[in-house]
Amino acid sequence: MSYLKFDKNLMINLEQSLPKEMLRTNQSGAYHCTSIVGCNTRKQHGLLVIPIPEMENKPHVLLSSLDETVIQHGAPFNLGIHRYSGGVYSPNGHKYIREFDCESVPRTTYRVGGVILTKEKIFISGENRILIRYTLVEAHSPTTLQFRPFLAFRESNELCMANSSLNTACEEVSNGVASCLYNGYPTLYMQFSHKPKWVNDPHWYNGIEYVKDLERGVPYTEDLWVPGYFEVPIKKGESIIFSAGIKEVSPRSLNKMYEKEIASRTCRSSFYNCLKNAAKQFYLKDKDGDFILSGYPWGTVLARNTFMSLPGTTLAIDHKDDFESIMATASAELVKYMGTGELSARIHGIDLPDIPLWAVWAIQQYAKNISTTAAHEKYMDLVEKIINYILENNHPNLQVDGNAMVSTIGTSTPVSWMNSMMWGKPVVPRTGYLVEFNALWYNALRFAAMLSENDEERQEFHDMCMAQVEKMAQPFVDMFLNDYGYLYDYVNGTYADPSVRPNMAIAIGLDYSPLD
């Protein structure tokens, strides 16, 4: 029994099915994202969205969608769906959906009269390529499938308007065609495992709307280019694979490529397996190293999010090697910043004052999940560098005072995760002594002392850490614990912010807390 399955009643009800979105990534920054009925509801949605290094590595939508049509006895049955001006949905392909499940890969089952057709989508790991396998499960008469590619070739946060600047040519390649609408973009190769018939039928499809953008009050209408369509006859029991990528592929390799990729997938047969799959979607591996993307479809690599999410996205799902490889990339950028002040080109926010503290916290989780011995062997040098860097007041915006408490300046630029800005100023200007910064600092000192406890060469370092711990324990309580039994959010001079925020939960939830 599939853990994630939606039946016909839900799928044909757009009020229920459109809000349900799915995401597939290749762990190299490319993704496929849409609603479970295949109707794009955001401008960031697309069948193939890839980062382009020559364009600041921002994600660009190359292939927005692929509309399928089942043809029997000359009668077309359109399986696609788009929203057009005025809230009109056309074609209404969702009415043919009988089931959607996502146990190993997203699979949609359509029924058109006597025809039962399944569609399964899979992203190739580490490659900018998506495969879609169509299987004709049942048919009582000759059947042909027609495919119309909707091309965008735009940055994922922009919209495309009909224009005359595009390159309309489609180059014939093995079992398909290749297209590149604008200079500077990679060529999109659209190929099949079976030889299709290509019909050149270029049109702009105008006035496509994205309802989520409409609700957000941002631009939501665009025009998409459809250069023509493919036609492929299919027999009962037969499967056809469609490939979209930025490199040409041998059509004969598509079946083997699909089977190899699906064999490596974790079935979503439980809530844990769903979380495991979701965690791995955010891995980003390229020539610069291994990273964690902060979110799709508009996330980037952020230092704080990397260290905060690293244990949960790796150690919690038994991916120790991924923790170590991502930590190696992130810690190298952190050490470079601590040594030279040079910002990272890939990991944004490496200069924020709490980043070293979250790095130590992530290593602490490694010690708990793997072993203290392993953590000491791999990360003791890094922990020592971080502690000394902070104690020597080398960070430009994190200062240690006489009570071993740390303060920061956040009046003009946000320094914590509460980083919303309005009119060039932080919405909440948290400045001075921040409760979670000091709790993280206390925790880091205690952990560093524990990690170096049996290290004869680091006894002086161990004693120094414990001295700082003893120095700040009572001042922390005196500064943050108020008469109402909870913690102030931050203290700046004579002002103590009484706002109840989750930052105090960090302070009480750490392994070592000055409140113990």
Task: Please name every model-derived segment.
Residues 1-267, 271, 297, 304, ...:
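Terminal accessory carbohydrate-recognition/targeting modules of carbohydrate-active enzymes
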Residues 2-17, 394, 456-495, 515:
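Non-catalytic carbohydrate-binding regions of carbohydrate-active enzymes
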Residues 111-115, 339-342, 486-488:
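Flexible, solvent-exposed coil segments and beta strand-coil junctions
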Residues 129, 200-229, 233, 238, ...:
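The feature captures the catalytic groove of carbohydrate-active enzymes
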Residues 259-296, 409:
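Conserved oxyanion/phosphate-binding beta-strand-loop segments in alpha/beta enzyme cores
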Residues 276-287, 317-339, 381-399, 413-414, ...:
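Long, well-ordered core segments of solenoidal/helical folds
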Residues 287-306, 344-345:
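Internal amphipathic alpha-helical repeat/solenoid segments
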Residues 297-330, 503-515:
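Alpha-helical support elements that line or immediately flank enzyme active sites
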